[in-house]
């Protein structure tokens, strides 16, 4: 039985390879963006309970894909056992922990908007530029499939929250996202300090760009994520204005 699952999650089941900005990369992006848009449009006129149920399902998928990964990693030859790198010290994995809290517990309503925006921003950044994460593996091996689907569910959950009107963005409160990014920075620094394995969580220890020094990476990471948050806000206001002029929608 173990041999079957090892084969199922093996990288060696295909001669195909996925690379940055190739047809397979764009295929995953098309599926995720297209599916998100479709769900947004299909449920736009549905009841509030139907929308809430959909958001709950995606919250379950986010945490399910994250936690389930720790059980499946030992069966995949993408990993040599359970990888500590998947612990919640990166912004995307931290969001996996935060999503259930803000979705299911009213006590966390105060940070729900920030978690939604950071979920969209972080997943969008990874999906559009996963960098060396697409290291020539087969496009449908476990490592690639799980990582894209996890980020896709995280992105979809965030976008649908905005589309269904679960929260409304206010640019005057974007400082909360900035504070959230700083908190994640401190948390990632703590993780990098206690796990001296070179994991480079949140990319704050070692530069991932040859033209930037290691010392400047914490600042660049904060500015980059906050910049994408500004893009999310800009898209939100732009789409809302378009909807107000042409189509009735919840955004």
Short names for language-model regions:
Residues 1-53:
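N-terminal topogenic module of multi-pass integral membrane proteins
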Residues 13-31, 176-183, 193-233:
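Membrane-interface transmembrane-helix boundary segments in multi-pass integral membrane proteins
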Residues 26-35, 88-98, 115, 128, ...:
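Membrane-embedded alpha-helical segments of multi-pass membrane proteins
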Residues 37-42, 98-100, 153-172:
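Alpha-helical transmembrane segments in multipass membrane proteins, preferentially the mid-helix core
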Residues 43-56, 104-112, 163-175:
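Membrane-interface helix-boundary motifs at transmembrane edges
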Residues 62-71, 119-131, 181-192:
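Aromatic-anchored segments of alpha-helical transmembrane domains
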Residues 78-91, 136-147:
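Non-cytosolic membrane-interface motifs at loop->transmembrane helix junctions
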Residues 101-162:
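Membrane-proximal helix-loop-helix units in multi-pass membrane proteins
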């Amino acid at each position: 039985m173990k041999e079957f699952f090892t084969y199922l999650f093996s990288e060696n089941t295909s001669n195909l390879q996925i690379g940055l900005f190739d047809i397979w990369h764009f295929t995953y992006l098309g599926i995720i963006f297209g599916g998100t848009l479709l769900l947004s449009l299909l449920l736009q006129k549905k009841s509030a309970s139907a929308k809430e149920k959909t958001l709950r399902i995606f919250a379950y998928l986010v945490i399910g894909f994250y936690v389930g990964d720790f059980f499946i990693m030992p069966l995949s030859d993408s990993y040599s056992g359970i990888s500590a790198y998947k612990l919640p010290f990166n912004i995307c994995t931290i969001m996996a922990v935060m999503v259930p809290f803000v979705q299911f517990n009213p006590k966390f309503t105060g940070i729900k908007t920030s978690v939604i925006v950071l979920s969209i921003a972080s997943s969008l950044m990874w999906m559009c530029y996963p960098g060396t994460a697409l290291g020539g593996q087969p496009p449908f091996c476990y490592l690639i499939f799980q990582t894209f689907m996890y980020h896709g569910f995280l992105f979809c959950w965030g976008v649908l929250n905005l589309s269904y009107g679960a929260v409304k963005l206010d640019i005057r409160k974007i400082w909360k996202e900035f504070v959230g990014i700083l908190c994640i920075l401190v948390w990632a620094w703590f993780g990098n300090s206690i796990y001296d394995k070179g994991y480079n969580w949140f990319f704050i220890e070692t530069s991932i760009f040859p033209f930037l020094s290691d010392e400047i990476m914490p600042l660049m990471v904060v500015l980059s994520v906050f910049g994408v948050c500004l893009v999310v806000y800009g898209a939100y206001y732009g789409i809302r204005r378009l909807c107000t002029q042409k189509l009735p929608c919840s955004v």
